[in-house]
UniProtKB/Swiss-Prot annotation:
One of its GO terms (molecular function) is thiamine pyrophosphate binding. CDD domains: TPP_PYR_POX_like. It catalyses: 3-sulfopyruvate + H(+) = sulfoacetaldehyde + CO2. It comes from Methanothermobacter thermautotrophicus (strain ATCC 29096 / DSM 1053 / JCM 10044 / NBRC 100330 / Delta H). Pathway: Cofactor biosynthesis; coenzyme M biosynthesis; sulfoacetaldehyde from phosphoenolpyruvate and sulfite: step 4/4. PANTHER family: SULFOPYRUVATE DECARBOXYLASE, SULFOPYRUVATE DECARBOXYLASE SUBUNIT ALPHA. This is Sulfopyruvate decarboxylase subunit alpha. The gene is comD.
Amino acid sequence: MKVDSSEAVYAGMKDAGIDFAVSVPCVNLRTVLEMVDADPAIMHVPVTREEEGFGVAAGAHMAGKTTAILMQNSGLGNSVNVLASLYSLYHIPITMIVSHRGTEGEFMEAQVPMGRATGDILRILEIPFRTPRSPAEARESIGELTDISLRTSKAVAVLLDVSYW
C-alpha cells in the first residue's frame, strides 16, 4: 500500500509516541493536522503563534507528555528566543515538524528569504534536523529524531520542503 506524505508524518508521530501536539495553521500540514485532531490518543492544541505553542508544549512536557509542534518555517524565526532560552536552558525536548517554505519550487517569493535561512538558524541553535525526501524517510526521521530529542532533552526538527508534498 502506498502511503502518502501526510499519512507518513502522522504515522511517524504515532510510532514515536507523541501524545501531545500544538500547531499553527499551515496549508501543507492541513491533512496531518486533521488526522492529529481526530486522534483521541493525541491531545491537540491549536495556537495562534509559535511562541505560544512552545510555551504550551513546555508545560505538557513537564506533565509527562511527549510533545511536537507542527508549524511553518516562517514561525521558526519568531521562535528563536524561546528555543535559545527556555528550551535550551531547561533541557526541554520537542519534535518540530516544519513545513519548509521558500525552497526550490516555492511559488510565493515572500517565503524565500526565510526558506534560505532555516537550516542556518537550526545549526546556530544546535538543533538536529533532517529533510526527508520521501514518506518512508519522513516516518523514519520523525521516530529517530524524537528518540534523540528524548535522550538528549533537546529540540529537534523535521523539515518538509516543497518537494516533499
